[in-house]
């Protein structure tokens, strides 16, 4: 692989992907594969921060119809992201690479509190930084968290890992005529209503001029391929 396109990025990983072929929980082979991909990508000379969802363990929006308030449900979901980050941290460190989990919540017995200074320091030290706890506030998705944290730590792009190789005009699994876009502007992504990322995340990325690269995580090495400019995906920028 050649020189990396970006030197500091935030990678957004779906919590559901952590479950592997299961409908719930953490699939260790999947976590191990992701850890290996992150380490390989870091070896390209890229400083890597990761935001992980919590949908493999808990989805706050789904319990709001069952008597749990949306703020409480979202908080439970954000705590699920901490568990995912700790599992990924352990998988990375088993490979003799340093990782640190920083949380939006104060939980000193578990992990450090996220601050910009701590994130900058650990990235400069060559550690993979795992950003847990969402924004720390209800009603915001982990997609929005990824864009927010990218702005805070000076990342050059957000890499949004999905189960398809970019943004399509329709669901390619349901519509074989769906068109894949090589590039979209932030405004086009918002106006098109594409479901690959929520509108708040796209709007914040537009406001901060932050590129988002949507790609498939299904194959090993896909993160490194995107970072080296050889991967297949959709660039949302401009």
UniProtKB/Swiss-Prot annotation:
Superkingdom classification of source: Bacteria
Gene Ontology biological process terms, A to Z: 'de novo' CTP biosynthetic process; UDP biosynthetic process
Pfam families, sorted: AA_kinase
Localization (cell): Cytoplasm
Functional pathway: Pyrimidine metabolism; CTP biosynthesis via de novo pathway; UDP from UMP (UMPK route): step 1/1
Enzyme class: transferase
GO molecular-function terms, A-Z: ATP binding; UMP kinase activity
Binding site for UMP: 54, 74, 135-142
Leader sequence residues: none
An annotated GO cellular component: cytosol
SUPFAM superfamilies the UniProt entry points to: Carbamate kinase-like
Xref: InterPro entries: AceGlu_kinase-like_sf (IPR036393), Asp/Glu/Uridylate_kinase (IPR001048), Uridylate_kinase (IPR011817), Uridylate_kinase_bac (IPR015963)
Catalytic activity line of the entry: UMP + ATP = UDP + ADP
Name of the featured protein: Uridylate kinase
Cited function: Catalyzes the reversible phosphorylation of UMP to UDP.
Regulation of catalytic or functional activity: Inhibited by UTP.
CDD domains, sorted: AAK_UMPK-PyrH-Ec
Family named by the database record: Belongs to the UMP kinase family.
């Amino acid at each position: 692989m050649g020189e990396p396109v970006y030197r500091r990025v935030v990678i957004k990983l779906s919590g559901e992907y952590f479950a592997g072929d299961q409908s719930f929980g953490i699939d260790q082979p999947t976590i191990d594969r992701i850890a290996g991909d992150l380490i390989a990508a870091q070896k390209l000379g890229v400083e890597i921060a990761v935001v992980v969802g919590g949908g493999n363990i808990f989805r706050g929006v789904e319990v709001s119809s069952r008597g749990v308030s949306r703020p409480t449900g979202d908080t439970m979901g954000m705590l699920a992201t901490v568990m995912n980050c700790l599992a990924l941290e352990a998988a990375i460190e088993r490979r003799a690479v340093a990782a640190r989990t920083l949380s939006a919540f104060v939980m000193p017995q578990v992990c450090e509190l996220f601050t910009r200074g701590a994130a900058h320091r650990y990235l400069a030290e060559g550690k993979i930084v795992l950003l847990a706890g969402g924004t720390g506030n209800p009603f915001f998705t982990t997609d929005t968290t990824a864009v927010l944290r990218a702005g805070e730590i000076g990342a050059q792009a957000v890499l949004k890992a999905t189960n398809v190789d970019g943004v399509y005009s329709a669901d390619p699994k349901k519509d074989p005529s769906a068109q894949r876009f090589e590039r979209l502007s932030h405004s086009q992504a918002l106006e098109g209503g594409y479901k690959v990322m929520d509108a708040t995340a796209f709007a914040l990325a537009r406001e901060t001029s932050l590129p988002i690269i949507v790609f498939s995580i299904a194959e090993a090495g896909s993160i490194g391929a995107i970072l080296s400019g050889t991967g297949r995906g959709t660039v949302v920028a401009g």
